[in-house]
């Protein structure tokens, strides 16, 4: 159930076609979870500043049941910052990513939970 959310001040017109699909495939590979369970939400055109500057930036979160922890998070950061830099032209030093290890009982899906 990994869920990756990107809030960014990059305009919608600058988000390339296929970006959501690329994020889905890359996260599936990185987490080892099936792509059909990966959710991606990109929220462009936000009023945002990072370090007092309105240059392109992103505030992100990755939620997952398991597969969250020190070494894994560093790997995800490298992957996700790289994709944001390459596709949205956001410098990695203008990106924060918060990681959340979710309890399966606290994640609802398909009329139930993952517990």
Curated annotation (Swiss-Prot):
Signal peptide: none
InterPro entries per UniProt: Macrophage_inhib_fac, Macrophage_inhib_fac_CS, Tautomerase/MIF_sf
Residues that bind substrate: 33, 65, 98
An MF annotation (GO) of this entry: chemoattractant activity
A Pfam family matched in the record: MIF
Residue positions, PTM N6-succinyllysine: 78
Compartments in which it is found: Secreted; Cytoplasm
Active site: 2
Keywords attached to this entry: Acetylation, Cytokine, Cytoplasm, Immunity, Inflammatory response, Innate immunity, Isomerase, Secreted
Entry keyword annotation includes Acetylation: yes
GO process terms (BP): carboxylic acid metabolic process; cell surface receptor signaling pathway; cellular senescence; DNA damage response, signal transduction by p53 class mediator; inflammatory response; innate immune response; negative regulation of apoptotic process; negative regulation of cell migration
The UniProt record lists the keyword rRNA-binding: no
EC code: 5.3.2.1, 5.3.3.12
UniProt modified residues of type N6-acetyllysine: 78
Induction of the gene: Up-regulated in concanavalin-A-treated lymphocytes. Up-regulated in macrophages upon exposure to M.tuberculosis antigens.
Primary residence: secreted
GO CC term (a single one): secretory granule lumen
Known catalytic reactions: 3-phenylpyruvate = enol-phenylpyruvate; L-dopachrome = 5,6-dihydroxyindole-2-carboxylate
Family: Belongs to the MIF family.
Function according to Swiss-Prot or TrEMBL: Pro-inflammatory cytokine involved in the innate immune response to bacterial pathogens. The expression of MIF at sites of inflammation suggests a role as mediator in regulating the function of macrophages in host defense. Counteracts the anti-inflammatory activity of glucocorticoids. Has phenylpyruvate tautomerase and dopachrome tautomerase activity (in vitro), but the physiological substrate is not known. It is not clear whether the tautomerase activity has any physiological relevance, and whether it is important for cytokine activity.
Disease: Rheumatoid arthritis systemic juvenile: An inflammatory articular disorder with systemic onset beginning before the age of 16. It represents a subgroup of juvenile arthritis associated with severe extraarticular features and occasionally fatal complications. During active phases of the disorder, patients display a typical daily spiking fever, an evanescent macular rash, lymphadenopathy, hepatosplenomegaly, serositis, myalgia and arthritis.
Subunit structure: Homotrimer. Interacts with CXCR2 extracellular domain. Interacts with the CD74 extracellular domain, USO1, COPS5 and BNIPL.
Extra remark beyond the main annotation: Serum levels of MIF are elevated in patients with severe sepsis or septic shock. High levels of MIF are correlated with low survival. Drugs that inhibit tautomerase activity protect against death due to sepsis.
Record-given protein name: Macrophage migration inhibitory factor
Species this chain originates from: Homo sapiens (Human)
């Amino acid at each position: 159930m990994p869920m990756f959310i990107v809030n960014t001040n990059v305009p919608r017109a600058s988000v390339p076609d296929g970006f959501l699909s690329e994020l889905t495939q890359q996260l599936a590979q990185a987490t080892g979870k099936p792509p059909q369970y990966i959710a991606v939400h990109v929220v462009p055109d936000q009023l945002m500043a990072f370090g007092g500057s309105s240059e392109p930036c992103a505030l992100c979160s990755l939620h997952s049941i398991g597969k969250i922890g020190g070494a894994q998070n560093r790997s995800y950061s490298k992957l996700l910052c790289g994709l944001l830099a390459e596709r949205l032209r956001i410098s990695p030093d203008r990106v924060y990513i918060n990681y959340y290890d979710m309890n399966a009982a606290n994640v609802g899906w398909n009329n139930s939970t993952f517990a």
